């Protein structure tokens, strides 16, 4: 395992590739399991972090989604949750600096890792087509990861929201066939949206 002091030193040194590799090697191996753990993540049902929580803790858990990354850390600090699930890196943009900053600020411990394949889909309410869409919503990372696809639709107005699944929820609640979201296929199922294009982050 690795001490809290060592983790803090890695965080302070920065979120470059070398230090992220050290973080990956440094996950605490002496984790004491909590019975019926309370688990929080950033996002809405259908978020990739929710899927990560289910991958790591099991499919029968009931993780609670929170609005912001820092809300996850605050919930643990205040004793309202036992574990928080946050993204450390993605293949497109590398290490996520905000998470490193929060780990350093709250002096929390990493206890494990899991990998979630990211396949973004373009989805919209029933009746929508690529021709009806004028606005597309996602987390800023989702928009960035789908840049090549979005460049083929230069007239679409791109609007970042707090998370990918929240974008699906917003579009579903609007019922507007001019609006589309980029997020996971599971989010489309949860919020009743039709998938128009799969794998838009692979374009």
Predicted regions and their residues:
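Domain-level signature for soluble enzymes in the chorismate/prephenate branch of the shikimate pathway
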Residues: 1-203
